[in-house]
Amino acid sequence: MDRSKENCISGPVKATAPVGGPKRVLVTQQFPCQNPLPVNSGQAQRVLCPSNSSQRIPLQAQKLVSSHKPVQNQKQKQLQATSVPHPVSRPLNNTQKSKQPLPSAPENNPEEELASKQKNEESKKRQWALEDFEIGRPLGKGKFGNVYLAREKQSKFILALKVLFKAQLEKAGVEHQLRREVEIQSHLRHPNILRLYGYFHDATRVYLILEYAPLGTVYRELQKLSKFDEQRTATYITELANALSYCHSKRVIHRDIKPENLLLGSAGELKIADFGWSVHAPSSRRTTLCGTLDYLPPEMIEGRMHDEKVDLWSLGVLCYEFLVGKPPFEANTYQETYKRISRVEFTFPDFVTEGARDLISRLLKHNPSQRPMLREVLEHPWITANSSKPSNCQNKESASKQS
């Protein structure tokens, strides 16, 4: 298992004084609340102002000074003793009620402006609390917590709130999976991937703010209908292949594709959820055994290195289960299931058509290099003949450029 990386900014930030004008000095921290913090009379207020105009200081912190030089010397000593943990932004006006910054100075430093925006976003994430939400009915229960229907009080936005208990996460040693899920899912933007809007925590619990999928899981729908017809199966496979193509373009491998981790939006569209087993794969090679037994490919149960082709295997297992109603390698014992996967032993019922058999057989290859590309899956004749959704795999390059 790879551990989550923690980013930080270290080292003090030194201010430089431009020649022939007021001094440009960085504040050491951003105001975290709506009203500016009071300034001690013995400590000068540090602000960021353009070099060719007068300084902008909150009204309550203004005071007369006889010259710039003594103030600059005093501020330099304070800056040398202070470490700035994050990029900073301009202070708010005391009369301002909102959290919006003042009109920006002439944009002569794009990197500074970008750092300020990033800091603002990070601050907003840290401001969520349970009191900001109205909690509704439970949507589901898991090993480490529950999911509830919720509504954000100010915007009235409907969402799902996933509540996880820290003690249970620590006892199972899966904190790294949670960090991985947050890190990966919060950066993915695709119509067939469930959004993670943010997170917060208290002394005993961690809360994930998730997109609400009102039609529930694909697993529940499959249990209700026993199996899906070809049109519905091909449509789901198209949506899933589009989403996986986007993930792979971001160097993300899901590794745990199964009906329980697939949700349905208000229009019946499929959405991938639960990225706890996912990884960023800069080396494209993983050797960790994870995921659900019925969906594990041979290279993983045999302890061999694997790449994004594991998701292609899972796609084949999923297509089979949609059409037949059970996974292709299902057996009475774990040992027998392992053997059937390693030997790729499975059979088709008579009602499965030749086109579906051909696609599934291509995906369930023991050798990962022999499995088709996602583009080939989307262009397969059985998919194009039965799916009601278009392929957007051709947009892979443009999707990889999105944030």
Curated annotation (Swiss-Prot):
UniProtKB keywords: ATP-binding, Cell cycle, Cell division, Cell membrane, Cell projection, Cilium, Cilium biogenesis/degradation, Cytoplasm, Cytoskeleton, Isopeptide bond, Kinase, Membrane, Microtubule, Mitosis, Nucleotide-binding, Phosphoprotein, Proto-oncogene, Serine/threonine-protein kinase, Transferase, Ubl conjugation
Cross-link type Glycyl lysine isopeptide (Lys-Gly) (interchain with G-Cter in SUMO2), residue numbers: K258
Coiled-coil residue windows: none
Listed Basic and acidic residues bias regions: 114-125
PROSITE patterns with a match to the protein in the record: PROTEIN_KINASE_ATP (PS00107), PROTEIN_KINASE_DOM (PS50011), PROTEIN_KINASE_ST (PS00108)
Assembly notes: Part of a complex composed of NEDD9, AURKA and CTTN; within the complex NEDD9 acts as a scaffold protein and is required for complex formation. Identified in a complex with AUNIP and NIN. Interacts with FBXL7. Interacts with CPEB1, JTB, TACC1, TPX2, PPP2CA, as well as with the protein phosphatase type 1 (PP1) isoforms PPP1CA, PPP1CB and PPP1CC. Also interacts with its substrates ARHGEF2, BORA, KIF2A, PARD3, and p53/TP53. Interaction with BORA promotes phosphorylation of PLK1. Interacts with CIMAP3. Interacts with GADD45A, competing with its oligomerization.
PANTHER family per UniProt: SERINE/THREONINE-PROTEIN KINASE IAL-RELATED
Function (record text): Mitotic serine/threonine kinase that contributes to the regulation of cell cycle progression. Associates with the centrosome and the spindle microtubules during mitosis and plays a critical role in various mitotic events including the establishment of mitotic spindle, centrosome duplication, centrosome separation as well as maturation, chromosomal alignment, spindle assembly checkpoint, and cytokinesis. Required for normal spindle positioning during mitosis and for the localization of NUMA1 and DCTN1 to the cell cortex during metaphase. Required for initial activation of CDK1 at centrosomes.
Protein name per its UniProtKB record: Aurora kinase A
Organism field: Homo sapiens
Gene from which this protein is expressed: AURKA
